[in-house]
Regions:
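An acidic, low-aromatic, low-complexity terminal/linker signal
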Residues: 1-155
Length: 155
């Protein structure tokens, strides 16, 4: 059994694997990152370290999250590929107040290949409708990953 944090984008439900979550915070203020796509909400500082923050609703639909009491900044462990370094990445999520415990095998392929949204994972159907698993490691296109997490300069 896996534990998931549920959230919504519009009327649709999505899930994040709780094992990929470092912290769930209230909605945080961010500093703009010039040159970043509009769905990059900005930069925040947590425990003295800068953390880039994505607006997941803006990434998926072009419309930013609505600041509500249920809107959260969720810090995840972002890693591109199995051998890549791990970074903290913030995600602005709406209605991030519920969890789901289920067998990960209950998520099945959705039948689509969203090349423009490779972070969209398998889906699960329950009494409330579909839930789609968000793949954290696939959230950032290569150019945005290079902007937010540049490779260290050689010594």
């Amino acid at each position: 059994m896996k534990l998931f944090l549920l959230f919504r984008i519009g009327a649709d439900r999505y899930a994040l694997d709780a094992a990929e979550i470092a912290e769930v915070l209230p909605l945080t203020r961010t500093k703009q990152i010039p040159g970043a796509p509009p769905w990059v909400a900005g930069l925040m500082v947590r425990h003295g370290q800068p953390v880039p923050v994505l607006d997941i609703a803006a990434l998926a639909t072009g419309t930013p999250v609505v600041p509500r009491t249920s809107t959260r900044t969720v810090l995840v462990h972002y890693r591109r590929g199995p051998d890549g370094p791990t970074h903290r990445l913030g995600l602005r999520l709406e209605f991030a107040t519920e969890t789901l415990r289920c067998d990960e095998a209950s998520f099945v392929a959705g039948g689509l290949d969203p090349a423009h949204a490779r972070y969209l994972g398998p889906v699960r159907h329950d009494a409330r409708g579909l839930v789609q698993w968000i793949t954290v490691s696939a959230l950032l296109p290569d150019d945005v990953q290079a902007l937010l997490f540049p490779a260290p300069l050689p010594a």
